[in-house]
């Protein structure tokens, strides 16, 4: 117990000091770390659906989009320019605070998750994956075309001029100065994302060891046996979709505030596949593994961006740097699955053989 406390304290100090050290090399590195934390939040949410309940969801990015567009519509002037009656109701604009938009995004995403879950309750495996994949694409196409006859999402042009996140009347879009040391906006976002990740890890851990978590895992292993044991598989599946969706909705809200711009292309099928890959490559159903997978796959493209340039130079410029980077990412993912088929950090219980009974 004492060693766990020491490890936790050291990790907290390291994660707190990391952006302060990284910003000396440029704010872009802090930005990469902040985005990596957002992907950790997304991976934790998908792990509830895929890792705990065993429901393969390839349309998880839809909940990410719901949260992002909800915040973008509330925090940008687009709605006020489109609907005059909204501008008259709120002449000063809607500048909702963190404590309002986060529960709102979580609730809206949860409702969307239940709406997705209800038609697919009897589907499993490949069929469920295909249906959820289609759902994710429907949301993206819907956002891409919802500019006629009334311009709500601004179509493929997206929504810009989105307000920074407000916490207690303070805008994270501006840096602060403490004791003569300036902490820029991107570092403040990093700390907010870190706090959300820590809170989410606690929630996921409590769910994992709770009766709900055990019910999800029973459904994952054998749904028929779970029904025989009296588990309401219908409600448990809907709860898994709703709980996982809340993480996606909150992540989308943070993404919109952080970027200041959203468009349908930010929520493509490739984004969904990357989130699934984070969960699977890290160690499906295992919180430390999921976090590791999310951090590595979120940071790897940016790190390889610096490697692809020299490699392009070595080939005499015959290969495009972007293609080289994608090739390196794909090679790394294939290598991980070949060397670690159960993930980089799999659950210790996974695949453990039951003890053999011995007679006297």
Model-derived regions: residue spans:
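Transmembrane alpha-helices and adjacent helix-loop boundaries
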Residues: 1-360
């Amino acid at each position: 117990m004492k060693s766990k406390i020491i490890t936790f304290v050291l990790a907290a100090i390291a994660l707190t000091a990391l952006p302060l050290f990284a910003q000396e090399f440029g704010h872009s590195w802090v930005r990469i770390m902040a985005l990596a934390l957002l992907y950790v939040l997304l991976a934790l949410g998908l792990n509830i659906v895929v890792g705990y309940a065993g429901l393969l969801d390839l349309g998880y990015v839809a909940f990410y989009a719901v949260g992002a567009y909800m915040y973008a519509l509330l925090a940008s002037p687009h709605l006020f320019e489109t609907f005059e009656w909204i501008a008259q109701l709120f002449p000063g604009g809607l500048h909702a605070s963190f404590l309002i938009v986060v529960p709102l995004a979580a609730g809206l995403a949860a409702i969307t998750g239940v709406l997705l879950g209800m038609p697919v309750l009897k589907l499993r495996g490949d069929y469920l994956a295909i249906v959820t994949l289609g759902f994710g694409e429907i949301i993206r196409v819907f956002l891409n075309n919802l500019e006629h006859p009334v311009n709500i999402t601004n179509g493929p042009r997206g929504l810009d001029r989105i307000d920074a996140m407000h916490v207690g009347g303070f805008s994270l879009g501006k840096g602060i100065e403490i004791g003569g040391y300036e902490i820029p906006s991107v570092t403040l976002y990093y700390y907010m994302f870190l706090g959300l990740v820590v809170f989410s890890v606690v929630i996921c851990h409590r769910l994992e060891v709770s009766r709900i978590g055990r019910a999800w895992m029973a459904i994952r292993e054998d749904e028929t046996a779970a029904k025989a044991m009296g588990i309401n598989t219908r409600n448990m599946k809907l709860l898994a979709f709703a709980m996982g969706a809340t993480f996606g909705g909150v992540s989308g809200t943070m993404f919109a505030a952080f970027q200041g711009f959203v468009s349908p292309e930010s929520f493509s099928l490739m984004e969904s596949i990357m989130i699934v890959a984070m969960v699977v490559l890290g160690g499906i159903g295992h919180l430390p593994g999921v976090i590791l997978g999310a951090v590595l796959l979120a940071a790897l493209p940016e790190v390889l961006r610096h490697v692809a340039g020299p490699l392009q130079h070595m080939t005499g410029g015959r290969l495009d740097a972007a293609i080289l980077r994608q090739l390196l990412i794909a090679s790394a993912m294939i290598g991980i699955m070949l060397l670690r088929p159960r993930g980089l950090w799999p659950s210790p219980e996974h695949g453990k053989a039951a003890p053999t009974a011995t007679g006297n």
